[in-house]
């Protein structure tokens, strides 16, 4: 999945708006983070902790949690390796969590 495809998908969800910079765009719903591009291959996504663990188990090559994020509702998606459907699923989880 490319950064442009991430943006197109995220912005297709109701209420999602793009913020950030050209190099590091971020997508928010109700001013709450859904996802943020760290670099062209790494996307940080807000995900509820129980769902994050399931995502990591199902897709260990495409997702990870660096030590600095372990206590947070976040996961990194490695866009060159992650299944596009799993990335969309994670974005959906973030959108559901943040729109409440």
Regions found by a protein language model. Name each.
Residues 1-100:
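Charge-dense, helix-prone N-terminal extensions
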């Amino acid at each position: 999945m490319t950064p442009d495809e991430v943006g197109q998908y995220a912005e297709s969800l109701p209420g999602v708006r793009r913020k950030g910079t050209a190099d590091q765009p971020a997508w928010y719903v109700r001013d709450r983070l859904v996802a943020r591009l760290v670099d062209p291959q790494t996307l940080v996504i807000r995900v509820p902790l129980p769902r994050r663990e399931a995502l990591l188990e199902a897709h260990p090559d495409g997702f990870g949690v660096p030590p600095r994020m372990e206590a947070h509702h976040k996961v990194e998606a490695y866009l060159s390796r992650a299944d596009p459907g799993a990335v969309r699923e994670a974005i959906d989880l973030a959108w559901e969590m943040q729109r409440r």
